[in-house]
């Protein structure tokens, strides 16, 4: 009989063939700093495009954590976020949890957006979600897979952006 793994901070047994995920790799203080920096980076870019600052939403943080867990477990459909599609999202799976690197991967998509046409572009969708004017709240979550040594960072936005037909009023330069 194979060994089973315990998800840290719970009594839930995880199938040993699946990734082993934890949040304890980062302390609460480190996570608070990470979230604060990510929100600051978002708001700095949003101000450049005349979008109001985002406010952190603890309920979205919880949803984002759950979604990150399920993504690393290859079960995103088990997340309420995946099922209901109520939020915008930016997601990355990466080996280092460095705010600026993560954020810049999304923000650098600005070069792919045509500000004259203001239409949805898959190649700029992370960027346009970040600066979407109607979005007011943000939630940030993550999971760490100790076996594969990767993080899943999930950023949720409410209300969601990238709504077809609404680019003209939500994106400005």
Predicted regions and their residues:
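Short clusters of hydrophobic/aromatic residues that line enzyme substrate/ligand-binding pockets
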Residues: 54, 91, 130
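Disulfide-stabilized extracellular recognition modules
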Residues: 20, 97-173
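Short, well-ordered surface patches within globular domains
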Residues: 20-87
